């Protein structure tokens, strides 16, 4: 129940205020979520934004709005490399503050975009096991997952994990956690980072 969670965390959200004041001084006022499709970036991101009083954006939706096409249509029309070029351009041009940004799983192929997002805030990697990922994901192409010809979910996972780890400021392991549990870990990690700022 999202409202129940919001009320539960909303009561404690002031404790994070001082940490975020410090983080803002270090250009860390945005929180960018990265990870595989199905890791919960949008689900966790929406609740995280409510708890912190932040805005929320989903960069996949920004891409669809800019292109006036669905992700799967863009991939079909432009191919995976064409899609990545568009994804890089859109993410590299995001200009927001006090915002939780849920990114597409393939954004880590876009170095320009990732450097921009890192310079504008803290990057949180929502880590998920391949087994859990396989259970959560349905139609990959329908979700706009960028797969090369003949590529499997396992090989895609192995290819992306080092990139997620490369760009992450914070890693949150979601194994054995529901949305609420993952959110708690994210908040605690952000608070600890704010305390050190």
Describe each region flagged by the PLM.
Residues 39:
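ATP-binding Walker
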Residues 119-162:
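A glycine- and Lys/Arg-enriched "phosphate-lid" helix/loop adjacent to the NTP-binding pocket
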């Amino acid at each position: 129940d999202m409202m129940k969670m919001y009320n539960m965390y909303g009561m404690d959200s002031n404790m994070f205020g001082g940490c975020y004041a410090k983080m803002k001084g270090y250009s860390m006022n945005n929180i960018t979520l990265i990870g595989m499709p199905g890791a919960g970036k949008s689900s966790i991101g929406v609740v995280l934004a409510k708890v912190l009083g932040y805005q929320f954006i989903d960069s996949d939706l920004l891409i669809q709005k800019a292109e006036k096409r669905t992700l799967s249509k863009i991939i079909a029309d432009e191919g995976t490399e064409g899609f990545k070029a568009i994804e890089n351009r859109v993410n590299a041009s995001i200009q927001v503050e006090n915002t939780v940004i849920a990114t597409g799983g393939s954004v880590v192929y876009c170095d320009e975009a990732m450097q921009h997002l890192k310079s504008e805030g803290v990057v949180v990697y929502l880590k998920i096991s391949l087994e859990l990922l396989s259970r959560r994901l349905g139609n990959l192409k329908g979700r706009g997952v960028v797969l090369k010809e003949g590529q499997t979910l396992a090989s895609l996972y192995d290819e992306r994990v080092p990139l997620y780890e490369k760009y992450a400021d914070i890693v949150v392991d979601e194994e054995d956690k529901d949305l609420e549990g993952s959110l708690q870990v994210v908040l605690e990690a952000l608070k600890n980072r704010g305390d050190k700022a």
